[in-house]
């Protein structure tokens, strides 16, 4: 069964990612960071499989650890001194924990952007913004598909060059460098020519002209309306929680969090449901499909 959020209206999918990424960047409470990272990681595994998630974790984990290490090296605020650096500056617990929180935030945002590139395809970007900002929408659609297409072309060209005896992994170091540069030059030239051809093709078809109409298969149905209402509720509820201080967590000069009350727990619960909304949509779609299949009489 296909991912349910991918089959929703592009405006609904875009609104969900805009909301969840904004919350992932703004809410630095440890509970929110854990929920956002787990939700983004699960969705990446749902879209790309476990192998795809592991491939992204190979560079996300070092990035998070680097952020955690750099922050206490340059920021020395905090009242809990753990040790003193060779420079004489204090190493504080608060700066270390804030570095870990910043690394978790960057990892969560990166995971959600991986999901964006898989769900919000180039045709959806053109559909959403083609009439309002046609030039920018075309540029965004080309950017979204540039990296995956560049990687595929890089692999294809490298394989073709390998069959011609120009392998980038065997031979003398100088020869491998020349082969790698040749492969990179071919792929860059290919990508630039493709981008120019796409721009010329869209211009010849009248893209961006006033009054131009376009054909689309997207229809806003009742399911999209229900998801949009759910996103509006989550956004307003979390906004109220942020203004009320229920999602606030202070790192400097000392660790300080608001009191744990049923209201603050409800804020975290709503945020967790927001991060795992794709799970809920898939579960509801699966139950509806099984119920419909079970109620259909056999021939």
Regions found by a protein language model. Name each.
Residues 2-48, 156-299:
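Transmembrane alpha-helix interface motif
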Residues 56-174, 290-299:
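Juxtamembrane/interface alpha-helical elements of multi-pass membrane proteins
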Residues 34, 49-58:
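Interfacial helix-loop-helix linkers and transmembrane-helix boundary segments
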């Amino acid at each position: 069964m296909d991912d349910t959020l991918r089959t929703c209206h592009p405006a609904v999918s875009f609104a969900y990612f805009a909301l969840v990424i904004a919350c992932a960047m703004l809410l630095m409470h440890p509970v929110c960071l854990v929920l956002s990272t787990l939700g983004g990681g699960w969705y990446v595994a749902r879209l790309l499989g476990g192998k795809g998630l592991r491939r992204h974790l190979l560079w996300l984990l070092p990035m998070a650890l680097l952020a955690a290490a750099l922050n206490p090296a340059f920021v020395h605020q905090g009242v809990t001194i753990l040790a003193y650096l060779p420079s004489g500056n204090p190493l504080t617990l608060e700066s270390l924990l804030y570095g870990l929180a910043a690394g978790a935030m960057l990892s969560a945002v990166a995971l959600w952007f991986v999901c964006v590139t898989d769900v919000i395809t180039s045709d959806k970007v053109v559909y959403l913004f083609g009439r309002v900002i046609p030039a920018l929408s075309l540029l965004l659609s080309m950017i979204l598909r540039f990296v995956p297409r560049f990687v595929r072309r890089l692999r294809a060209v490298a394989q073709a060059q390998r069959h011609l005896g120009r392998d980038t992994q065997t031979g003398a170091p100088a020869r491998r460098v020349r082969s790698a540069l040749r492969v990179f030059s071919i792929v860059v030239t290919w990508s630039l020519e493709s981008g120019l051809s796409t721009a010329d093709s869209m211009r010849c078809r009248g893209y961006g002209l006033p009054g131009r109409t376009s054909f689309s298969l997207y229809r806003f149905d009742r399911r999209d309306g229900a998801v949009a209402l759910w996103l509006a509720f989550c956004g307003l509820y979390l906004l109220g929680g942020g203004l009320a201080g229920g999602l606030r967590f202070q790192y400097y000069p000392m660790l300080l969090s608001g009191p744990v009350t049923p209201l603050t727990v409800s804020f975290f619960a709503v945020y967790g449901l927001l991060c795992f909304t794709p799970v809920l949509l898939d579960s509801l779609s699966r139950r509806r499909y099984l119920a419909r299949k079970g109620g259909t009489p056999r021939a």
